[in-house]
UniProtKB/Swiss-Prot annotation:
Keywords: Activator, Developmental protein, DNA-binding, Nucleus, Transcription, Transcription regulation. One of its GO terms (cellular component) is nucleus. One of its GO terms (biological process) is positive regulation of transcription by RNA polymerase II. Its main location: nucleus. The keyword Amino-acid biosynthesis does not apply. Predominantly expressed in petals and stamens, less in carpels and sepals. This is Floral homeotic protein PMADS 2. It comes from Petunia hybrida (Petunia). Transcription factor involved in the genetic control of flower development. Residues 3-58 form the MADS-box domain.
């Protein structure tokens, strides 16, 4: 008696379903590895369980992006939507602009100009001339600013020197007055010592004669 056809349907028991998923998943990945080795095939496999956890396998000789690109080219089906397509086009446009800027920069340096025609060389020369004029104008502006700052610093230096000189003169004037006062005091002391004793006492005791 032959075996009856087994109906394939969802396993209701969650535990049994998880066990069956793990076994079948491991079996599929094992078969993918075997066909890669035995047949030199390129295999890419992605599995998502009902929990959202991902398992994947890709042949060592390729990558998942390469497999997807190959699928898109072979099948003629577009895997990316318009948004991704626009983003890819924008990236390509920016790359081209960057390449063009690099070429122009080399031309400005005088490199790789043998391929330029007369008109292109004229445009390049005009651009360099305008650039030199702008640089010269900027240099002149910076030079004027430097000279102006030098004048300001020189004026401030003169003012500081004048203030310092005035302060030194005031200090010297005070010292001279102190020196003159010391000399005058010494002269008075000397004259006082040269006077007779009686005369020295008389100014200090004006009523002495009256008592005598």
């Amino acid at each position: 008696m032959g075996r009856g056809k087994i109906e394939i349907k969802r396993i209701e028991n969650s535990s049994n379903r998880q066990v069956t998923y793990s076994k079948r998943r491991n079996g599929i990945i094992k078969k993918a590895k075997e066909i890669t080795v035995l047949c030199d095939a390129k295999v890419s496999l992605i599995i998502f369980g009902n929990s959202g956890k991902m398992h994947e396998y890709c042949s060592p000789s390729t990558t998942l992006p390469d497999m997807l690109d190959g699928y898109q080219k072979t099948s003629g089906r577009r895997l990316w939507d318009a948004k991704h397509e626009n983003l890819s086009n924008e990236i390509d446009r920016i790359k081209k602009e960057n390449d063009n800027m690099q070429v122009k920069l080399r031309h400005l340096k005088g490199e790789d100009i043998n391929s330029l025609n007369h008109k292109e060389l004229m445009v390049l020369e005009e651009g360099l001339t305008n650039g030199l004029s702008s640089i010269s104008a900027k240099q002149s502006e910076i030079l004027r600013m430097v000279r102006k700052n030098d004048q300001i610093l020189e004026e401030e230096h003169k003012q500081l020197q004048y203030a310092l000189h005035q302060k030194e003169m005031a200090a010297m004037g005070g010292n001279m007055r102190m020196i003159e006062e010391v000399y005058h005091q010494r002269d008075r002391d000397y004259e006082y010592q040269q006077m007779p004793f009686a005369l020295r006492v008389q100014p200090m005791q004006p009523n002495l004669h009256e008592r005598m």
